[in-house]
Amino acid sequence: MEKRDNLITRKEFLKISAAGIVGVGLLGKVPGVIAKPTETHTPKTLDYRILGRTGIKVSSVGYGASRTLEPSLIKGALDNGINFFDTGRRYFRGQSEVMVGKVIKGIRKKVVIQSKMRIHFGERGKGLDNQEMRKSLRNTMETSLNKSLHALQTDYIDIMLLHGASTKEEINDDTVMEFFLETKRKGKIRACGFSSHSNQLELLRDVNESKFYDVIMVPYNHKGSYIHSRAGYHSEWNQPAVDEELKKAENNGIGVVAMKTCSGGPYSSDGVAKPTFKDALKWILSHSYISTMAVAMASINEIKEDVQSMF
């Protein structure tokens, strides 16, 4: 799935302009899975939320396609009411996007696709003052976007993120911001943002100040930490401080996508009942500033269990 004179500077202009170029939501509410009525309760529908100022309506539980190339799981998620799918150019060397693209072909307007591009800035974002390096960065972003569009078999991507941003220099870089503004104007993407696996508190504070980005994707769970299942590294965050910044993001119209949602382990809402991953997701969704989440689901049974948290 982290950057004077009497006139405003170019960067200030970019930040002011960003809020006005977010695409309008394509869809009305996606039909939910309706619970069978009984004599004792009214029917319940799945939870769909608006992704910040983008106006895009997303299922509050989304499918994270970073760990599978099995199209039946994408189809299963669709069949169970999920309309938000997270992928990235880096996953399976682009094959994740190819797989998602094959499944959504013919139903593009019924789904919301979030993808990511990985770019490298060197140490702490330094070394981009050279014009040739900036040109190279621009070309890298353009090439990555075009490859994603081709793989996904679409002419637009709903949300495009910088993958794994960790410094303010990255997210505030003029070349990056100009690229995102231009591609939004051209209709190639509807919204832009970044994902961050570390240093997210600093980046959250920065994005709340600049208000340039439409969407942010950060780790979030009841435990306030995670261990990366593949790389094995550990990360934790100051939950109260992160909560404060996420509330500000909601007020600023910034859509929040949660990741590492199950890395905190199962959860018991009352401390008595057996902890479950469904309740862990429900805990996340109890916070209104979470628009949706990208959850890796390895089976149809996991999909059905996780979807229950949306009721």
Which residues does each PLM region occupy?
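N-terminal secretory signal peptides and thylakoid transit peptides that target proteins
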Residues: 1-22
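Beta/alpha (TIM)-barrel catalytic core signal, keyed to glycine-rich beta->alpha loops juxtaposed to Asp/Glu
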Residues: 11, 93, 164-311
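C-terminal segment of N-terminal export signals and the immediately downstream linker at the start
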Residues: 29-61
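Conserved, mostly hydrophobic/aromatic
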Residues: 51, 63, 85, 100, ...
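Short, acidic/polar
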Residues: 68-77, 137-151, 199-206, 277-281
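Acidic (Asp/Glu)-rich catalytic clusters
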Residues: 77-79, 101-108, 150-153, 207-211, ...
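Glycine-rich, proline-tolerant flexible connector loops at the mouths of alpha/beta enzymes
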Residues: 86-104, 168
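Active-site groove signature of glycoside hydrolases
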Residues: 150-168
